[in-house]
C-alpha cells in the first residue's frame, strides 16, 4: 500500500479550500457573536459513556472507539458536538438564566452519511439553553437562516417537523413504542412498505396515524391535514400549533412541513428543522429542541440549537475563495519592510516574491503591487 494514501472518505484540505472554509468559519462565528453567543471548545476525545448519553443507537454506531492507554477505559472520538456542549452547560457553567453557546470543530464518523460524504466533518453550530418558549426556537431558526445567507446560499427551504408527534403516539401505544427504533428508521427513510409491515398488528388509530406521517409533507396547509388525520391528543395538538407558529415567523426562506423528517429524533424533544438548497439532496443544516439531553449530566435544561458541516457548505457556497493581495518585491530595505508591516497590520495580504519566483501565485488575486517611486513605497494597481 502506498504510504500517501488516506482512508476511504477521508481527504486533505488544500489551500484554496482551506481558505474558503476559514473565511466562512470567521463569518459565521462573527455573526454568532453578534447575537450574543459565547464560544466553547470541547475536546475531540472523551470517555465513551459521556459522548453517548443521548442520540440512541445511530450515534453509537457513528462513534469511533478506542482504549485509553492511561486509564484502560474506552474512549470515543466525538461524532457530534451537541452532547458535549450540553455537558458544558449542565455541569461546568451551571448558570441559571439563558445561556447562548456556539462552537466549531472537527467530528469523525465511522461511516459516511452519503455516497461522497466525508467521514471527517467540520461542525459549526449554536445552542440556546434555559428558555422553553418558542422564542428560543424562533431565534435559532433565524440565526441558522442568517448564517446560510452569509455563505451565499440562495433559495433556501426550511423543513419543519416535531418530535412530539411520534412521542405522543408511542406514549399511547406500548406495542408501537417497543419497535420505536425500527419505526423511526422506516419513517426517516420514507420506507412505506417497511412501515406498513411494522404497523400491521398495531391498533387501528396508531396504525393509521403512523402510515399517514410520510404523506404529511408540503406547505403549511399540511398542518390542517395533520389535524384531521392524526389523533386529537393534547401533545399532538400542541406540536402542530408550535409548527404553525414557527412557520408563520419565517420571512426569508420557503417553508415546508415534513412530519416524517425525523433526523436525530432520538434526542430531540420538540420542534425539529432542516435547511435544503437546490441541487443538494441532503440537508445543509439541521437542528431542533432537545430539552432532556442535559439530564445525563445532572441538570436537564430547555435547549434548542442547530449545526452544519462547514466543509460541505464550502463545497457548494459561491463565496470567492481567492483573496485579494498585494505583490511586493524581496529586498533588504528597511523602508520596504516598514511598508509591508504597516499593510499587514491594516489587514492586507502582502506576498513578497522570493528571488527567482516572480510569477503571480495562482492562489491569490494580486491585483496591486508595492513599488518604489521617488524613494517611497506606494501601492499601484497591477
UniProtKB/Swiss-Prot annotation:
Pathway: Amino-acid biosynthesis; L-histidine biosynthesis; L-histidine from 5-phospho-alpha-D-ribose 1-diphosphate: step 1/9. It is found in: Cytoplasm. Keywords: Amino-acid biosynthesis, Cytoplasm, Histidine biosynthesis. GO terms for molecular function: histidine-tRNA ligase activity. InterPro entries: aa-tRNA-synth_II/BPL/LPL, HisRS-like_core, HisRS/HisZ, HisZ. The keyword Nucleus does not apply. The keyword DNA repair does not apply. Pfam families: tRNA-synt_His (PF13393). CDD domains: HisRS-like_core (cd00773). One of its GO terms (biological process) is histidyl-tRNA aminoacylation. GO terms for cellular component: cytoplasm. Belongs to the class-II aminoacyl-tRNA synthetase family. HisZ subfamily. PANTHER family: HISTIDINE--TRNA LIGASE, MITOCHONDRIAL-RELATED, HISTIDYL-TRNA SYNTHETASE. This function is generally fulfilled by the C-terminal part of HisG, which is missing in some bacteria such as this one. Required for the first step of histidine biosynthesis. May allow the feedback regulation of ATP phosphoribosyltransferase activity by histidine. NCBIfam families: hisZ_biosyn_reg, PRK12292.1-1, PRK12421.1. Heteromultimer composed of HisG and HisZ subunits. This is ATP phosphoribosyltransferase regulatory subunit. It comes from Burkholderia pseudomallei (strain 1106a). The gene is hisZ.
Amino acid at each position: 500500500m502506498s504510504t500517501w494514501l488516506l482512508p476511504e472518505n477521508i481527504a486533505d484540505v488544500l489551500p484554496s479550500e482551506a481558505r474558503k472554509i476559514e473565511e466562512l468559519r470567521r463569518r459565521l462565528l462573527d455573526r454568532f457573536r453578534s447575537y450574543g453567543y459565547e464560544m466553547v471548545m470541547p475536546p475531540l476525545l472523551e470517555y465513551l459513556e459521556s459522548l453517548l448519553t443521548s442520540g440512541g443507537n445511530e450515534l453509537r454506531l457513528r462513534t469511533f472507539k478506542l482504549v485509553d492507554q492511561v486509564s484502560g477505559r474506552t474512549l470515543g472520538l466525538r461524532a457530534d458536538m451537541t452532547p458535549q456542549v450540553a455537558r458544558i452547560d449542565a455541569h461546568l457553567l451551571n448558570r441559571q438564566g439563558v445561556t447562548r453557546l456556539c462552537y466549531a470543530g472537527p467530528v469523525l464518523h465511522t461511516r459516511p452519511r452519503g455516497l461522497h460524504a466525508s467521514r471527517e466533518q467540520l461542525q459549526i453550530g449554536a445552542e440556546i439553553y434555559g428558555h422553553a418558549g418558542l422564542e428560543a426556537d424562533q431565534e435559532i431558526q433565524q440565526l441558522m437562516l442568517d448564517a446560510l445567507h452569509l455563505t451565499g446560499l440562495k433559495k433556501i427551504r426550511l423543513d419543519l417537523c416535531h418530535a412530539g408527534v411520534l412521542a405522543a403516539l408511542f406514549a399511547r401505544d406500548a406495542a408501537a413504542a417497543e419497535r420505536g427504533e425500527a419505526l423511526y428508521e422506516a419513517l426517516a427513510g420514507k420506507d412505506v412498505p417497511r412501515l406498513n409491515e411494522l404497523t400491521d398488528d398495531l391498533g387501528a388509530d396508531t396504525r393509521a396515524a403512523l402510515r399517514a406521517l410520510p404523506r404529511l409533507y408540503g406547505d403549511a396547509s399540511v398542518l390542517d391535514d395533520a389535524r384531521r388525520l392524526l389523533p386529537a391528543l393534547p401533545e399532538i395538538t400542541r406540536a402542530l400549533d408550535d409548527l404553525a407558529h414557527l412557520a408563520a415567523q419565517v420571512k426569508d426562506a420557503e417553508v415546508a412541513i415534513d412530519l416524517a423528517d425525523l433526523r436525530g429524533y432520538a434526542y430531540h424533544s420538540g420542534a425539529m428543522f432542516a435547511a435544503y438548497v437546490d441541487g443538494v439532496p441532503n440537508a445543509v443544516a439541521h437542528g431542533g429542541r432537545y430539552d432532556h439531553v442535559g439530564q445525563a449530566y445532572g441538570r436537564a435544561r430547555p435547549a434548542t440549537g442547530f449545526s452544519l458541516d462547514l466543509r460541505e457548505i464550502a463545497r457548494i457556497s459561491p463565496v470567492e475563495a481567492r483573496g485579494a493581495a498585494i505583490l511586493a518585491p524581496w529586498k533588504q530595505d528597511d523602508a520596504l519592510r516598514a511598508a509591508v508591516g504597516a499593510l499587514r497590520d491594516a489587514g492586507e495580504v502582502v506576498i513578497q516574491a522570493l528571488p527567482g519566483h516572480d510569477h503571480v501565485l495562482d492562489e491569490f488575486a494580486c491585483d496591486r503591487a508595492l513599488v518604489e517611486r521617488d524613494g517611497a513605497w506606494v501601492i499601484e494597481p497591477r
